[in-house]
């Protein structure tokens, strides 16, 4: 993100972790098996050419498969802990509702929607609606239309009613119906 990110995503830890959380929601919200790479749930920011001590050796091409620093202290950083919590909740959603993530579930999405991407999953009366605002400018909120009814945001536990909703930049809603565990 530091190399290719634009605006605050390249410079702000908060924006980076929010963006990574949106990516995690989209990765873990799609059906099929998943792999989390090397402390990605904490926003790990050492590249593959880093030594076990954390020294970047990109220019040498060495250390690609060597041990990497384990950064459990990242859990003490609120922005990184928030990212970790998103991974936990999304994995909990997957583990408690495996039928939603199997080949026979109904799945639709707008991966190219900008700035708000959406995803819908359903199976056997269980329904999940995901809305993620990828806009990089923190002041850029978007109005979305939530399906009618009362939903629970799986990430926060808050109740959300259908209708218009203002989704701020860098945030997501993972709305579930009462059948979802």
PLM-predicted stretches and their roles:
Residues 145-157:
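Solvent-exposed beta-hairpin/edge-strand motifs
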Residues 66-112, 171:
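Aromatic- and carboxylate-lined catalytic core of secreted/periplasmic carbohydrate-active enzymes
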Residues 161-181:
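C-terminal beta-strand-rich structural cap/linker in extracellular carbohydrate-active enzymes
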Residues 27, 39-41, 90, 129, ...:
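Conserved, mostly hydrophobic/aromatic
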Residues 41-45, 126, 134-137, 172, ...:
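Short, solvent-exposed loop/turn segments at secondary-structure junctions
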Residues 1-8, 28-78:
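Aromatic/acidic polysaccharide-binding cleft in carbohydrate-active enzymes
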Residues 109-145:
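Carbohydrate-binding surface patches
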